[in-house]
Amino acid sequence: MKKNLLTLAAVLCWWVAIPIITSCSTDNDDNPVTPIEPEALAECTIMWYGTGGGNVDPYILTDFRQFYDARPESFDRVNIVAQYKASLNPSVYRDMTDEEVSQKAEELAAGKTVDELEAMTMEDYFFLFHPKRGATYRFAVDPAKTLRQQMLETEPYGAMNCNFTCPDSLTNFINWAARTYPAKRYILVMADHGGGYLPNHDVAEAAATRGMVFDDGYENGNTIGNKHKCFSAKSFARGVRNADVRPEGIVLYLCLMNNLEFLYDVKDVTDHIVCSTYTLWGTIGAMQSLPDNMAAGLDTRAALANFVDANVDSWDNNLYNPDHPEEPNYYDMTLTETKRLNDLAPVLKEFTDRLVDTYQNGTAEQRAAIDECTANAVKVVNQYSLYDMAKYMESLSLMLPDVFDYAFYDRFADAFNACIVHQRYARYLTNHNYQVDYSMMLAVKGCYVCYDYDTTDTKLQAATAYYPDGTTTTSKYVLGDDSGDGHYEFQENGTWPSTFADTYQQTTFDRLVGWSRWLLLNETAPPAWCPSSFNFELPSDDMSEIPVL
């Protein structure tokens, strides 16, 4: 399904505002698996690069295990290779000794057939091969074996607790894959946590921009919040760019990565990129559809579009309840043609120019309208300051038609639609004609807030404000009386390892668009909560007259 942004006239019909360190590379690139030499060059090599980030090891490996479900004939034309780093302290057996882990694995496997072992829960299955803490494994998928069998027979690669998020490590892996399993085309898949755009996740090197793939074996310099070292957009792009081959597509099996600040920094290292605006579901996707579609000889764009559909359909089949169709589900996938982002940038810059000028020099009524739109921006995750870009711009265009006229909005819609090759989102969202768009950051005078929620009952626990000068203030949320009211109490001051000027303002997105001008100027706080994190029910009125996006 190709999503098309509506013209401004159509928007008027339906819009409603909703209030250098040791790396995993070594001098010895010996392949731990003996490859089978193909009679002809393979159609594609899929390169999977993932780590557990402390608490998702079983989930990403359950997703990876789906590759073994690809059609047998697909393995004749497609290679699948992997590099996986086990968390240094995986949550599954965080409080157990190595001896206790081995004992439980033996107990779980006792008397079980191969099929029974493969049918185990994700956590129990992880115990069956219990990778060494902080070890890195490199191997190629052998369809004659199971993931468990391959993990048990694969020796750790490189140094223990290597820096998995070092660009050299990623480059080394891609080069090994291309040299050992050459193919006509290459697809890179990244698996772990996605951090959303956060300047405080920027590492010191190269004015980086985004956090993804969090290595629990290393710290990044934050005194508050997520301390794990991670890839930034620039360090990730450098790892891909320095490789000997260029992937035609990149799949980010990570949450929150369909973000403009990230996409602009990686747009030149691949032709197509697949990622999600909201959080994505692990363990119930359709990873096997990727080799099956590539083996069928489809062009990369068509194969990735089918992959998007297969994953979201699988999530729907597992999560959508036809007896309760109004039960909220928020998930999505978008396929972007990266070169089209170049045409979107000047339109976004013009939008920013008009917004900043109106806020500074417009009437009191215009400024109030802008504040109202900001206060009702649609957030995509509770914890981070990421907001739906198109909905925000649509609301501003609706409220300020004298500033953002029909002709301008239509130019924006055309450039926006050209970027999106294919998109699919939850059946629940589709039934409500609820579009899902790229995210971007919002801030107040350059300050943004990260919220810590109890994921069990979605109660707010704390909030950390990140200031442009690199300082932070964390306040604990204290419940009030029986009415449910609460208040913030100061907890501590801290720092993050850089400044707004050295992080956000060095992004490709900001250099092209100048969005930081608005982030530093805006004086209205955007919403602290998002519909998806609280499973917010969209309006259940008859939606039949609302045009399909």
Regions found by a protein language model. Name each.
Residues 1, 16-42:
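Bacterial Sec-dependent N-terminal signal peptides
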Residues 1-12:
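Bacterial N-terminal signal peptides that target proteins for export
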Residues 30, 37-60, 71, 85-91, ...:
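Cell-envelope and extracellular/periplasmic
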Residues 33, 203-549:
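Terminal, contiguous helix-loop blocks that mediate binding/assembly
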Residues 42-45, 74-80, 181-187, 244-249, ...:
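Loop/turn elements at helix/coil->beta-strand transitions in domains of secreted/extracellular proteins
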Residues 52-55, 86-90, 192-198, 218-219, ...:
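Solvent-exposed loop/turn segments at secondary-structure junctions
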Residues 61-64, 68, 167-175, 233, ...:
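Extracytoplasmic/secreted envelope proteins and their assembly/folding machinery
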Residues 81-184, 198, 205-219:
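Substrate-binding cleft of extracellular glycoside hydrolase catalytic domains
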